[in-house]
Amino acid sequence: MTHPVPDTGPASENMAPHRLRARPLGLFLPQQQPAVVMRTDCYICRSEGLAARSQVLIQAGGREILASLLHSSGEMIAPGEIGLSESAAAALGVAPGDAVSVRHAPPIDSFGALRGRVYGNRLDGAAFRSIVDDIVAGRYSDVHLSAFVTACSAFPLDHAETVALTGAMVASGERLAWGSDVVVDKHSVGGLPGNRTTPIVVAIVAALGLIMPKTSSRAITSPAGTADTMETLAPVNLDVGAIRRVVDHEGGCIVWGGAVSLSPADDIIIGVERVLDLDAAGQLVASVLSKKLAAGATHLVVDMPIGPTAKVRSPADAAALSGALQKVAAEFGLILKVMQGDGREPIGRGIGPALEARDILAVLEGRDPPPDLARRACELAGALIELAGRASPGTGAALAAQVLADGSAWSKFQRICEAQGGMRTPPLSNHRHVMTAQRPGRVSAIDNRRLAKLAKLAGAPAAKSAGLEMHVRLGSAVETGTPLLTVHAESQGELAYALAYAEAVGPILELSDR
């Protein structure tokens, strides 16, 4: 039901002060940030001094949100109307024509502490809780968020601050409990294409009776996140009740973390970090550990690939990050082990949701599996098994390989998929192009970042079947015409776009003389 509001100004006897008619615009902003659009000649903007990019309080039907204000001087918005972004309209639950009230947003109490941090002051737990609460409540605009991320990067968080931020992020959302002294989890630091070990690890450890409720992310800058890949095999958008049912029946799940409110501030902060290309160690540690603690983990293995084009580029960087993770985890009673690995090249053959899913199936079914993916999955699963006390030190990987070989992991994975809503077959691409060696030689270097960009230009992860299929590895000997990789796309245009990039960017795989 709509509530019409006249187009006239404040003198109209039928119009309550500061009320306008809602007009949903279908406008999407980064991080689903709520925004409203008002005319530059709107009497409310003039009387209240509402400038563009101001934070405003919007109320309708008992609901309220904070939103960023945009101005329009054209005919997009009629007199007496207010345009609403998609997230703003959804949060308010309004239909076209519904009455909406507008006023100045209240002051942000936590911003004083943040200003102090910009000038080098350390923050305590209360300050971080106040900041994180304001972030989750939507009181921080993208400008405020950028200031927070920059302040914590230019002047890095110390140990006490990292602990405080981690605790504040955990407290900002739901926290799951599983009624068990041992709940295992795994995290990959990232930066390596493919490397889709998580579904295999979950299947192995759940087959051994361990509890592993895995909440995973979608891709932000990569060709696929675990949730994107898993979605080609089974539904992943499960609420907390559904997650509990799956885990109660099967001991594990692989679901999208965005469907549940675990450390919600983390998702918001990560989005800003990506735009600013900032990835400070303290915030990374708080991000990883807050999600795992909120998910109820007691034992965690961190996969940390090291390589010149991976996220962690040197042994020194790996040692520093590993130490920080260990120290902060200990403050929360989380038992953690870091597994460093070779990050010089992709793991597995596929890069992109469906292609990575096919690698997972090949490993679980024992059907021509990529050896490196099977090996790394068993190493990580073995570390979790040992950490949980189910195997003596040095024997976990062999036990994981046995569970993989005898079909127990494959059977468990199928049951998890069915419990999540039914198993699916990953789609096949419509268009493919094989890139071949232009001369004889040996593969001496692989640029992970360029591979990831090539896969994204081909359409991944939005196009589930798009991406790359690797045919060679570091050290492979090739002749002229030897297939190096196949580009997969769902449309001819996306394929052409990806190939144009590959031709322009220079070598993605470098060949040396034999």
From Swiss-Prot:
Record EC number: 2.4.2.4
GO cellular component term, pick one: cytosol
InterPro entries per UniProt: Glycosyl_Trfase_fam3, Glycosyl_Trfase_fam3_N_dom, Glycosyl_Trfase_fam3_N_dom_sf, Nuc_phospho_transferase, PYNP-like_C_sf, PYNP_C, Pyrmidine_PPase_CS, Thym_Pase_Put
Catalytic activity: thymidine + phosphate = 2-deoxy-alpha-D-ribose 1-phosphate + thymine
Superkingdom as given in the UniProt entry: Bacteria
EC primary class: transferase
A GO molecular-function annotation: thymidine phosphorylase activity
SMART domains linked to this entry: PYNP_C
The protein, known as: Putative thymidine phosphorylase
Record organism: Sphingopyxis alaskensis (strain DSM 13593 / LMG 18877 / RB2256)
